[in-house]
UniProtKB/Swiss-Prot annotation:
Binds to the 23S rRNA. GO terms for biological process: translation. One of its GO terms (molecular function) is structural constituent of ribosome. The keyword Transmembrane does not apply. InterPro entries: Ribosomal_bL9 (IPR000244), Ribosomal_bL9/RNase_H1_N (IPR009027), Ribosomal_bL9_bac/chp (IPR020594), Ribosomal_bL9_C (IPR020069), Ribosomal_bL9_C_sf (IPR036791), Ribosomal_bL9_N (IPR020070), Ribosomal_bL9_N_sf (IPR036935). It is found in: Plastid, Chloroplast. This is Large ribosomal subunit protein bL9c. Keywords: Chloroplast, Plastid, Ribonucleoprotein, Ribosomal protein, RNA-binding, rRNA-binding.
Length: 154
């Protein structure tokens, strides 16, 4: 019969698990490899309690972030279409292109919510028209709206 002990992983290990995972390993593996190389710590009653408290705090922070993202998405869901004016040349071609900064500032002026460039997904826009604009907060929190490019005459 092999002696198995419980350890808490401090680093991601392909064959055991990710950081914070509680695993049972043979005592030789733990004391000769994992613990001396600071890959794991011995799972005592105190360290398990501390680990559980840490996981609870981490989950609470994730829930708060999820709630904030959900509230932001609700604000953006109220917007069905935004319009941007651009200077136009021949054949309804716009000068330059519509970039993320313009969209972010336009949405900020409407909602008061700041977005990052990585949240905005829009096609390459070189002409007047209506395009789909996607705002992706997380894989399950997404907002779609229309982006209308109008001519601007100076």
């Amino acid at each position: 019969m092999k002696n198995k002990i419980t350890v808490i992983l401090k680093k991601n290990l392909a064959n055991l698990g990710s950081i914070g995972t509680v695993v049972k390993v043979s005592s030789g593996y733990a004391f000769n490899y994992l613990i001396p190389r600071d890959f794991a710590q011995l799972a005592t009653q105190g360290s398990l309690k501390h680990h559980k408290m840490f996981l609870d705090m981490k989950q609470q922070k994730l829930d708060e972030i999820q709630d904030k993202l959900q509230a932001s998405a609700q604000k953006f869901n109220k917007i069905s279409k935004i319009s941007v004016k651009k200077k136009v040349g021949n054949n309804n071609q716009i000068f330059g292109s519509v970039n993320d900064k313009e969209i972010i500032s336009k949405l900020f002026s409407i909602t008061g919510e700041k977005l990052e460039k990585k949240n905005i997904y829009l096609p390459n826009i070189k002409a007047l028209g209506i395009y789909n604009l996607n705002i992706i907060f997380t894989s399950d929190i997404q907002v779609s709206m229309k982006l209308q490019i109008l001519p601007f005459f100076a």
